[in-house]
């Protein structure tokens, strides 16, 4: 009897899993569905770049990241969209964040040796390391930083497309549009159902198509709460993003810059060679979009991505943070317009662990979610671990970290760079110029 899996969502988790299952011939039929073609506008990874770095205070994530980075470097397709530009990270004024970074750096040196990182103990040393970049920058004299010259970024939208093409080559079937837009789970028994268990469900899409499957993987990113009651295990959060367009001459000046990461303010990527855009993202303020649901009393209000018309403006605090960052690090660009602004919606968990587990109320549904803003780097290898969870082979260490929690509430992380969580509907939006 043939076995079928339906993967709902063609972002990082969904595509990586589709490729892994197809390579291993774990299912006879693999169907991946989404409302939009890859890269979907609803995917957090639909962007020009995402950071790829190994620093984690948790050793198991660090090892997972190093494994992924080897694949970024050596995979024939993915290496073409991976850029190892290095990352300059300033030391936070927040003691919890500073402690997190200290532990992460110690872990990396433990695994790779002291040469893995370069410590810069003053603004003078930072300028000496990057003389052309920071010659006019008013850096604080006591500013300290750490450089990882082996970190980098990948073109995230292009990476998703490459994985889709790989999956197609391996025989994965893709369905987009209304026939691929998840609507709900239904109990709709097919002739192949033996026990007719009411907890064995099928997928119904927007146009009424019903997909029967032995196994379903729900990998819908920030939209999970719209389809499934997770009892607040995950929360959709919006992160502000903007860009600066460089001229050809400016591109020559900034093309060799590292990622500059200031956890107290914002961060910036080198200009992408094709578009010559520098991407900026602010830290400190995150946004939720709370809506009422018909879930149980404990989940009456959940956050899902804002579904109204997208705003061409940004929250006021985000612009303030980005401008402060530019004034400090890239003053020659400080008066430039912020363009292509958007909110990048992620699926966040309180402890930053992913949610990769069987959904308790169903017999045949698994979930891969909770990217928490750091999952993209694992695009080359996370599918292997999701597949292991589906097939029952995942290590106990990862099973415990990624389990579906109900009674045991996860511990909130104090090191996160979040000063305030603001409801999207209450945020003050403004135009940059």
Swiss-Prot record:
Gene3D superfamilies, alphabetized: D-Amino Acid Oxidase, subunit A, domain 2, FAD/NAD(P)-binding domain
Glycosylated residues in this chain: 24, 119, 188, 229
Residues spanning the signal sequence: 1-18
Keyword Lipoprotein attached: no
Any matching Pfam family: DAO
Disulfide bonds: none
Cellular compartment(s): Secreted; Cytoplasm; Nucleus
Alphabetically ordered keywords of this record: Cytoplasm, FAD, Flavoprotein, Glycoprotein, Nucleus, Oxidoreductase, Secreted, Signal
Keyword Glycoprotein in annotation: yes
Reactions that this protein is recorded to catalyse: L-saccharopine + O2 + H2O = (S)-2-amino-6-oxohexanoate + L-glutamate + H2O2
Known cofactor(s): FAD
GO cellular component, one term: extracellular region
Record GO biological process: L-lysine catabolic process
Summary of subunit composition and partner proteins: Monomer.
Family under the similarity heading: Belongs to the MSOX/MTOX family.
Name assigned to this protein: L-saccharopine oxidase
Gene name in the database record: fap2
